[in-house]
């Protein structure tokens, strides 16, 4: 029975691998005439309203922060949005890139511990948000389609206000792409349904005939620096914070409860 389960798992993985391979196009076919490339830490490709992000091969295994804010719209100005946060970029199989958020309640602090391999096998983390690779660049960078995540999705970022109604997907558009030293940002104009009566006397709001208003949102992808025993805080200006987890590298017979207090000065 156990052998049958193992065989089924292998066949499932092989099927996923073959399916991923079939969807990957040669770069010459992907980079069509009229496509625009924006260089940077994460190169971006734009063509016919579609947006693609390249993940260089050397960044697989690195961590990235996905954050967002509402720039303007609905009488809101520079309001923070709920971002996905810190993710680890992984590629569990060829043709797939995942944004993983590992569960850190158990760790091995000693990176050279003999238990590292056994721990990684027994403490398998969920893959997270999966993205199919559409092509590989000449430098073997994985290129993924991110149009839906920016224009209509709520997996990367979201916001909730009682006066912001449902999204009108057909009107969404990317209005600005800005590469910077640590990553890239996307400014997106989304249109949402609105209560027209709420903005009858607002001088800053223009309600469209179909009952929708624009909302500008900026989503930022930032590559985080490599750091031994990475413990990421939401804001590095926080003077202290205590984290609790269990370490398996201090005692070969049992786990040890650890409390870390971040005392870095702002």
Residue ranges and their predicted role:
Residues 1-7:
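Bacterial N-terminal signal peptides that target proteins for export
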Residues 5, 16, 76-78:
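Short, intrinsically disordered/low-complexity patches at protein termini
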Residues 11-19:
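Hydrophobic h-region of N-terminal signal peptides that target proteins for export
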Residues 22-263:
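Auxiliary tRNA-acceptor-end handling modules of aminoacyl-tRNA synthetases
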């Amino acid at each position: 029975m156990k052998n049958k389960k193992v065989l089924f798992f292998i066949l499932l993985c092989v099927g996923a691998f073959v399916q991923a391979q079939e969807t990957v196009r040669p770069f010459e076919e992907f980079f069509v005439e009229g496509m625009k490339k924006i260089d940077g830490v994460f190169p971006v490709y734009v063509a016919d309203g579609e947006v693609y992000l390249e993940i260089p091969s050397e960044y697989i295994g690195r961590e990235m922060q996905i954050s967002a804010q509402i720039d303007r719209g609905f009488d809101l100005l520079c309001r923070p949005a709920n971002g996905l946060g810190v993710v680890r970029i992984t590629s569990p199989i060829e043709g797939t890139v995942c944004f993983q958020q590992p569960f850190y309640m158990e760790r091995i602090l000693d990176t050279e511990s003999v238990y590292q391999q056994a721990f990684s096998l027994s403490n398998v983390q969920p893959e997270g948000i999966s993205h199919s690779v559409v092509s590989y660049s000449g430098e073997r960078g994985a290129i993924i389609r991110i149009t839906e995540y920016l224009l209509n999705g709520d997996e990367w970022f979201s916001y909730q206000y009682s006066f912001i109604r449902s999204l009108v997907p057909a009107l969404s558009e990317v209005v600005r792409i800005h590469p910077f030293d640590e990553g890239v940002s996307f400014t997106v104009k989304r249109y949402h349904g609105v209560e027209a009566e709420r903005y009858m006397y607002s001088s800053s709001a223009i309600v469209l005939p179909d009952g929708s208003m624009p909302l500008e949102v900026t989503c930022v992808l930032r590559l985080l620096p490599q750091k031994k025993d990475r413990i990421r805080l939401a804001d590095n200006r926080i003077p202290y914070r205590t984290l609790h987890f269990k370490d398996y590298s201090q005692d070969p017979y049992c786990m040890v409860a650890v409390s870390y207090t971040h005392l870095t000065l702002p």
